[in-house]
Structure formats: C-alpha cells, structure tokens
C-alpha cells in the first residue's frame, strides 16, 4: 500500500502518520477489521538478555499504539524459541541459554512492558504469553506431520536469514533452520487460543511473519495479517540502540535513567522529528512545531524528546532527576547525586590510574585508544578542566567532594568514587 493511501481505522491512521508502517499483508482487510471492532495483535520477543534495548522500542511502541486505539496487545515471550535462536541478521549461531537463564531474562523483560502497556483481564488489556507453553509439548514426529508438510525446503533456503549464511559459507545448524517453523506455529496457536489476527515486527521479520500468516490461513482458514516497521537507523546510518559504551537498555538495572536521558538528548538534529513521532505520545502538531525550531533551538526539542522518552520508560520522577542532573552538570558545572557513578578501589586510586584506562573502564570511551583521540581533540575533562594528556595519572589528589568528575565531550559525565 502506498504512503498516500487512506486508512479508515484509527490504528492504521496513527501508524501511518507517525511513520511505523513498512509493509502490510492484506491491508484493506486489516483496515476493515480494525475499523469494525477489537483486533488482537502480537509481537514476539526472544529472551536473550535480562532487558530489551532501544532497538526493540519501536516494537513496544507499536503495541502501545495498538492499545491506545482500543485494541488488544499480546506480548509473546519466546521462552521456547529462545532455546533455538533466531538466525535473522546473525552471522553465527547464538549461544544457547539454560532454562534458568531464560526464565530470569523473561522476569527482567516483564518490568519493561509494565511501563508501556496496561495489563489485565479486560477486552483491550495486554497479556503476556510464553510460547514454551505449546512448543515444549510438541512431539517431534507430530510437529513434522502437522506443520512440516506446509513448508518447502526450497522456499526456506530462499529466506535472507538462510541465504546470507550460505552465501558467506557460515554454518547454520538444523536447530536454527527450524526457527521459522516454530515462529509460524506461534501465530497459529495464538489465533486459536486468543483470536489473534495480526503479527507485527521489524522488516527483517517479514519472511517469518508471512509464514505465520499463510500457515494460519491454510490450516484453519482464518483471517491473519502481518505488518512490519522500517528497520531503524539514525540519520548518519548508525544502528539504533547501540552507543560507544554499549546497548541502550530499557531497564534501570542495566542503564541508569540519567544515561537513558542523555542518549535521547544526543539525538542528531535530522532525527528529532522522526523520533518524537515514534517514541513519544506528543500530538503531531506539537511535534511539527518542535522539529521546526531554528538553529540551536533544536536542542530544546531534544530535551523534550529526552524528557518524554525517559518519563515513559522510567517514570516522571526519574525523568525530572535526569534532566536536573544534566543541567547542573553541564550548564552550572555542579555535582549531582543523580549523575552516573563508577566505583573504584580506594587503593587503586591511591596508587594512581592512567586517565585513558579510567575513561575506558568507566564507559566514557570504547577503548584506551579512543580516550587518547578524544583527549587530543579537546574532548576530555577532569573536574571541569580540559585534559589533553590521556596518559596522565589520576590519583586521590584529584578528589573533589569525594569524587573525580570525568567528562567526555559536552554531554557524558561520570563521577569516579573510591570505595
């Protein structure tokens, strides 16, 4: 469906206006279903880490938009598929996790969704389902007889996730090869148990989603639809959700609300309007006003983006604390208890530690070499004073109010605290 096409349903109108839609199967049928009643839709998330990161946020926001439009979201946790590992976009096999690791990861991920969705027993309340419930019950022969007949190896070999591995002569295990069948069965099971008619996901999941749509229509002759979002990258082409210091996690245990706020504050100028549409609930007319701010005033829009995104993920208080800490640190030069802290053994600081090493250890630079280049370019500060020599030794003599304040560029600060 073209970008100019007009939808009748509030749900698809919102997705289109805010830039979420990449591809849709059966768009007219889906639009009619969403305009005529409650649509139940799901997105699957494998439990490969104890949190999700910003790279998954567009999918979380899709479920939020679905619920805001009066429909029912299903968060499908891949307790079963995580045991296999999604080969999509991977050059090598994932490390297999134990059942205990998967359960712990699911518990961490549940905390994320509670901030974005309303869960409960109502007709449009979100529910969380684990595909291990049905996948673990299948006998191998039964699974092949019931579902293997609907998939040809010819077609499976044509999927990008498989084809790219083979072209690069990189091994793919038979375990991974089965992933697409398992994901297709997820849709069928959710359709039967919960009346789910729509699977959503990133555009890299298009093939897997098509499998589920076609399996559900072929086996049970039920309505089934698929919808994908564009793969998200910054204006400069960087992968969304990754920084020099690592992944931008959505759980406070993995990344502080302050660092989360700073991630959004550091958004490139060209991305501000797009990210406000995708990652905040601000009205479109207000977003249009913010993205039109001239010159340096665009920084005000970035602060609004950071405020709104952090409020959604961490709550109003944490968003306010993060902004206050940033303003104190960068605009007033003051210390704040809400700034990120890196703890170091008091004996190690007393003996002295090379600044480049400290920068890398504290997450202000990806490596010692990066820290040295940053210092040479004037981007390193110790206690608010520029330090061009990354080889200089930091000791307890540098303590101010019990900490050493390190800054990388204009927007990243860590307080080094001896313990």
From Swiss-Prot:
Main location class: cytoplasm
Record-listed ATP binding positions: 242
Residues annotated as domain S4 RNA-binding: 353-418
Pfam families in the cross-refs: SYY_C-terminal, tRNA-synt_1b
Motif 'HIGH' region, chain ranges: 47-56
Biological process, per Gene Ontology: tyrosyl-tRNA aminoacylation
Localization annotation: Cytoplasm
Keyword ATP-binding: yes
CDD domains assigned: S4, TyrRS_core
Alphabetized InterPro entries for the sequence: aa-tRNA-synth_Ic, Rossmann-like_a/b/a_fold, S4_RNA-bd_sf, SYY-like_C, Tyr-tRNA-ligase, Tyr-tRNA-ligase_bac-type, Tyr-tRNA-ligase_bac_1
First-level EC class: ligase
Binding site for L-tyrosine: 42, 179, 183
Keywords: Aminoacyl-tRNA synthetase, ATP-binding, Cytoplasm, Ligase, Nucleotide-binding, Protein biosynthesis, RNA-binding
GO CC terms: cytosol
NCBIfam families (alphabetical): tyrS
UniProt-recorded name of the protein: Tyrosine--tRNA ligase
Native source organism of the sequence: Caulobacter sp. (strain K31)
Upper classification of the organism: Bacteria, Pseudomonadati, Pseudomonadota, Alphaproteobacteria, Caulobacterales
Gene assigned in the entry: tyrS
């Amino acid at each position: 469906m073209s970008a100019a096409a007009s939808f009748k349903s509030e749900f698809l109108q919102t997705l289109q206006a805010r830039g979420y839609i990449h591809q849709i199967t059966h768009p007219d049928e889906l639009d009619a279903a969403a305009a005529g009643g409650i649509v139940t839709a799901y997105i699957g998330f494998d439990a490969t880490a104890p949190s999700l990161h910003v790279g998954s946020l567009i999918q979380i926001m899709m479920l939020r938009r679905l619920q805001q439009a009066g429909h029912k979201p299903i968060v499908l946790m891949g307790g079963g598929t995580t045991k296999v590992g999604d080969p999509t976009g991977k050059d090598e096999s994932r490390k297999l996790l134990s059942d205990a690791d998967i359960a712990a990861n699911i518990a961490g991920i549940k905390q994320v969704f509670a901030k974005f969705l309303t869960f409960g027993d109502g007709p449009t309340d979100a529910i969380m389902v684990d595909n291990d419930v049905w996948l673990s019950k299948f006998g191998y022969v039964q699974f092949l007889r019931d579902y293997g007949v609907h998939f040809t190896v010819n077609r499976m070999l044509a999927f990008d996730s498989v084809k790219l591995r083979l072209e690069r002569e990189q091994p793919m295990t038979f375990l991974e090869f089965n992933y697409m069948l398992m994901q297709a069965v997820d849709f069928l099971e959710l359709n039967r148990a919960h009346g789910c008619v729509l699977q959503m996901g990133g555009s890299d999941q298009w093939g897997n989603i098509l499998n589920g749509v076609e399996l559900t229509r072929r086996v049970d002759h039920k309505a089934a639809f698929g919808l994908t979002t564009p793969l998200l990258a910054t204006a400069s082409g960087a992968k969304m959700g990754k920084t020099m210091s690592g992944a931008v996690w959505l759980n406070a245990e993995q990344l502080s609300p302050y660092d989360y706020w700073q991630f959004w504050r550091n958004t490139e100028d060209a991305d501000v309007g797009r990210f406000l549409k995708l990652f905040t609930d601000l009205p479109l007319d207000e977003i249009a006003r913010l993205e039109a701010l001239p010159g340096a005033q665009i920084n005000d829009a970035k602060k609004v983006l950071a405020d709104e995104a952090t409020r959604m993920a961490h709550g109003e208080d944490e968003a306010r604390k993060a902004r206050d800490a940033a303003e104190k640190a960068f605009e007033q030069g003051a210390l704040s208890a809400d700034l990120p802290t890196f703890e170091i053994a008091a004996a190690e600081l007393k003996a002295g530690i090379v600044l480049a090493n400290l920068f890398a250890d504290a997450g202000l630079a990806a490596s010692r070499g990066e820290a040295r280049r940053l210092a040479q370019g004037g981007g390193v500060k110790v206690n608010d004073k520029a330090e061009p020599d990354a080889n200089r030794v930091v000791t307890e003599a540098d303590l101010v109010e019990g900490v050493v304040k390190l800054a990388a560029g204009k927007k990243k600060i860590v307080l080094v605290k001896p313990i």
